[in-house]
């Protein structure tokens, strides 16, 4: 009875949540959205920026931050530039074409941050003498192997040039050195004419190493001045100079006695720390922009001197000097730290008959004089300032390496001939013999006259071909001498 009641009870039908049509439309819509997202983000999306060299080895703190994407820096840049960023639709005025340089462009910390160089903060300490103390950098010192190779090539070229010009009457190193040491304004009267007997420019090269960049105090630059320190060592070389002269005794009468002297000075070893820095030169005020002195602020004598200078032409004239005025140039300043080492070997020979050889006192005097000369020029706090040349590319300084121009032209001609696949046309720089022999496709025999009839500059169209006339003898390449074309 219970089983019969179970079969007789009507089952409750399950209602589906979505119909078949609604599910089909939802599936199609999801597929369309997926395809649209794929096309938008994978096909029309912007390619990622290529990573810069050495980016993988940099730490997270080394990542470059662009000020255009930062709100604070963008506001500061807008304030320094004097307004909102310039758009392409705006037409800049003729006086404001070049955008202003940010004030932090030459800041030391900004340069170190953008070049990923770890240097200590600009904390300066002074010694008792008032000089700043060298602040060592926390960056790892760098080797200068590539710099040593360039310096060695330069020195080797100078040595070779000096040897090739040893017999030149104007550019000889012997004549230049003799004229320098025999300068009558510097040579004492008790020293006779100095004759150079031997010069050795050496065979070895200086080795630079352990380069590091530090920050030194400079009131003329923002945040201090960057300075590169590198160790230099030159040893086991034969740099030497030998001279002969005479000491003259001019009392009681001129040339009362003459004492021959021969000296030879050799550099045994030199080592020290070289300091290199770039110093921007001060902008020279152009004469046109120089203010005219006011007569009320000057007395009569000063005003008269100024007017006389202008009338006499001593004042600067912008048209008289072809060089550009008011353009600052960067200077290279280099010097050595006081802890340098310069070992010399001095040999002397005094007298004519009874000669004194290698007198210690003479060696001490010569070494002291050389050390004094060196310290007065390139030892801190004295520096040597050299103006850097103009490195802007110019047409007048453009050159082609020898032997590569002709090879490049021949390669271009051969490539164009092979790409056409037919009879190549001759160029004025390629001889006709090379064109005929190197032709990749030979549709038929090409006839040419005897050698010397046509110059190498004639083109392919000017070569003789088989004409309609039958009486003209034709030469076939490879035929016997005197043979006739049948």
UniProtKB/Swiss-Prot annotation:
Residues 92-103 have a biased composition (Polar residues). It is a single-pass type I membrane protein. Residues 140-389 form the SMP-LTD domain. PROSITE patterns: SMP. It comes from the Eukaryota. GO terms for molecular function: lipid binding. GO terms for biological process: mitochondrial genome maintenance; mitochondrion-endoplasmic reticulum membrane tethering; phospholipid transport; protein insertion into mitochondrial outer membrane. Residues 52-103, 413-486 are annotated as: Disordered. GO terms for cellular component: endoplasmic reticulum membrane; ERMES complex. Residues 45-486 are cytoplasmic. It is found in: Endoplasmic reticulum membrane. Keywords: Endoplasmic reticulum, Lipid transport, Lipid-binding, Membrane, Transmembrane, Transmembrane helix, Transport. InterPro entries: Mmm1, MMM1_dom, SMP_LBD. Residues 67-84, 413-426 have a biased composition (Low complexity). Component of the ERMES/MDM complex, which serves as a molecular tether to connect the endoplasmic reticulum (ER) and mitochondria. Components of this complex are involved in the control of mitochondrial shape and protein biogenesis, and function in nonvesicular lipid trafficking between the ER and mitochondria. The mdm12-mmm1 subcomplex functions in the major beta-barrel assembly pathway that is responsible for biogenesis of all outer membrane beta-barrel proteins, and acts in a late step after the SAM complex. The SMP-LTD domain is a barrel-like domain that can bind various types of glycerophospholipids in its interior and mediate their transfer between two adjacent bilayers. This is Maintenance of mitochondrial morphology protein 1. The lineage of its organism: Eukaryota, Fungi, Dikarya, Ascomycota, Pezizomycotina.
């Amino acid at each position: 009875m219970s089983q019969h009641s179970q079969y007789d009870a009507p089952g409750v039908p399950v209602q589906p949540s979505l119909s078949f049509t609604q599910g089909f439309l939802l599936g199609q819509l999801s597929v369309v959205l997926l395809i649209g997202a794929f096309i938008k983000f994978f096909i029309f999306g912007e390619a990622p920026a290529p990573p810069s060299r050495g980016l993988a080895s940099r730490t997270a703190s080394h990542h470059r931050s662009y000020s255009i994407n930062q709100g604070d820096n963008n506001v500061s840049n807008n304030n320094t530039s004097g307004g909102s960023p310039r758009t392409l639709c705006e037409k800049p005025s003729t006086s404001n074409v070049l955008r202003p340089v940010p004030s932090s462009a030459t800041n030391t910390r900004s340069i170190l941050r953008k070049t990923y160089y770890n240097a200590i903060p600009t904390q300066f300490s002074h010694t008792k003498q008032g000089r700043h103390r060298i602040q060592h950098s926390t960056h790892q010192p760098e080797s200068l192997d590539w710099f040593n190779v360039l310096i060695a090539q330069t020195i080797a070229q100078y040595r070779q040039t000096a040897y090739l010009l040893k017999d030149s009457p104007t550019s000889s190193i012997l004549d230049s050195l003799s004229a320098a040491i025999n300068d009558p304004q510097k040579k004492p009267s008790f020293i006779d004419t100095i004759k150079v007997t031997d010069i050795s420019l050496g065979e070895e090269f200086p080795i630079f190493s352990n380069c590091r960049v530090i920050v030194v105090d400079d009131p003329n630059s923002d945040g201090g001045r960057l300075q590169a320190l590198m160790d230099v060592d030159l040893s086991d070389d034969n740099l030497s100079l030998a001279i002969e002269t005479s000491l003259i005794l001019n009392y009681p009468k001129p040339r009362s006695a003459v004492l021959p002297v021969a000296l030879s000075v050799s550099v045994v070893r030199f080592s020290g720390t070289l300091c290199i820095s770039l110093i921007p030169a001060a902008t020279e005020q152009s004469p046109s922009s120089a203010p005219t002195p006011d007569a009320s602020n000057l007395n009569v004598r000063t005003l008269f001197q100024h007017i006389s200078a202008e009338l006499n032409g001593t004042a600067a004239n912008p048209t008289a000097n072809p060089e550009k005025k008011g353009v600052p140039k960067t200077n290279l300043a280099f010097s050595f730290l006081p802890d340098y080492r310069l070992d010399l070997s001095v040999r002397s020979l005094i007298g004519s008959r009874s000669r004194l050889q290698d007198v210690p006192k003479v060696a001490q005097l010569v070494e002291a004089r050389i050390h004094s000369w060196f310290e007065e020029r390139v030892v801190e706090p004295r520096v040597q300032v050299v103006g850097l040349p103009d490195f802007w590319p110019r047409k007048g300084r453009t050159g082609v390496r020898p032997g590569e121009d002709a090879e490049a032209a021949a390669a271009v001609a051969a490539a164009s001939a092979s790409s056409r696949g037919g009879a190549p046309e001759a160029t004025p720089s390629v001889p006709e013999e090379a064109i005929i022999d190197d032709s990749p496709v030979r549709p038929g025999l090409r006839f040419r006259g005897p050698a010397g009839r046509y110059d190498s500059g004639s083109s392919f169209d000017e070569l003789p071909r088989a004409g309609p006339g039958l009486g003209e003898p034709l030469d076939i390449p490879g035929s016997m001498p005197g043979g006739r074309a049948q």
